[in-house]
Swiss-Prot record:
Signal sequence region: 1-25
Keywords, ordered alphabetically: Developmental protein, Disulfide bond, Extracellular matrix, Glycoprotein, Lipoprotein, Secreted, Signal, Wnt signaling pathway
Its biological purpose: Ligand for members of the frizzled family of seven transmembrane receptors. Functions in the canonical Wnt signaling pathway that results in activation of transcription factors of the TCF/LEF family.
Biological process annotations from GO: canonical Wnt signaling pathway; cell fate commitment; cell migration involved in gastrulation; hepatocyte proliferation; liver development; neuron differentiation; swim bladder development
Naturally occurring in which organism (per UniProt): Danio rerio (Zebrafish)
Disulfide bond sites: C74-C85, C125-C133, C135-C155, C204-C218, C206-C213, C276-C307, C292-C302, C306-C346, C322-C337, C324-C334, C329-C330
Post-translational modification: Palmitoleoylation is required for efficient binding to frizzled receptors. Depalmitoleoylation leads to Wnt signaling pathway inhibition.
Coiled coil: none
GO annotation, cellular component aspect: extracellular space
Protein name: Protein Wnt-2
Superkingdom of this protein's organism: Eukaryota
Keyword Disulfide bond included in the entry's annotation: yes
Amino acid sequence: MNFLPNGICFYLSVAICWFSSRVDASWWYMGTLGSQVMCDNIPGLINKQRQLCRQHPKVMQAIGAGIKNWIGECQHQFRTHRWNCNTMAREHNLFGRLLHRSSREAAFVYAISSAGMVYTLTRACSQGELENCSCDPGKKGSSRDAKGAFDWGGCSDHVDHAIKFTQVFIDAKERKERDARALMNLHNNRAGRKAVKRFMNLECKCHGVSGSCNVRTCWLAMADFRQTGDYLRKKYNNAIQVVMNQYGTGFTSAYRMLKRPNKNDLVYFEDSPDYCIWDHESGSVGTGGRVCNRTSRGTDSCEVMCCGRGYDTSRVSRTTKCECKFQWCCAVHCRDCQEEVDVHTCKTQS
């Protein structure tokens, strides 16, 4: 069975769509186009996505501005990993051929990007940047929690509105294809959307005499996106390799000893490459030139990161804060000091 996405890869422009391997324009170039021009000229969008793009230009602009945030979070989560969520400036799409393989890395990218769109749109709604959405209109009147009664007030983040739009827009093409890879993408998209909603916090303000809390006004707010990133990284670590069921309508675990995936799990079909060396077919850029930690025993160690090729050591000078003193009240003053440190970088393949 062929699990290649066959044109269902990432689309990244002002909106996060799904890239076709035939796209020649880079995503940041498309992001500079006007919304009408962008919607009419990006190849690979199906009619439903193109229609939504034209109808909601400000939404597309907000999504485009938020792309760097989820990419940055992806790169943070994998900063000590052989695959570090690197982007391909000279390729036809942002992640090169990585997304052609139905790997756990592809599963993570689909999930974190879907979560990133939900987070971006929810925040834009709460800040009044978009038409047709604002704070959550359902959070009115009174309610209770473990601390007692409170009144809804402030601006509760309307995450359900963002989830609905993200699902309709991103999933449109996958629902049209309905092949094995499309079902994988739909599953991981949903896991990403659900992850954002998992970290909604109840925040409250007290009202009363002398700071007492006789009356509380509360609202629901999204946690920092880092929590979503941390959660999805754990899901990546425990992602479940699956095969299609006999009816072609869902998944079952590839190995009997593994649990059946639930809606929160990430799923994938194909094993990942080792990402040690540059390989165009798999989308691996290799680890040559990557900084490694000589004393670590983790994934950032020179032994693991460099895949046994060895490493080079260079002496570099860096600026650090030193001789810090507390000054009443209330500041800390430090000097800038220069120190020489060893930096270890992986050798390239011979």
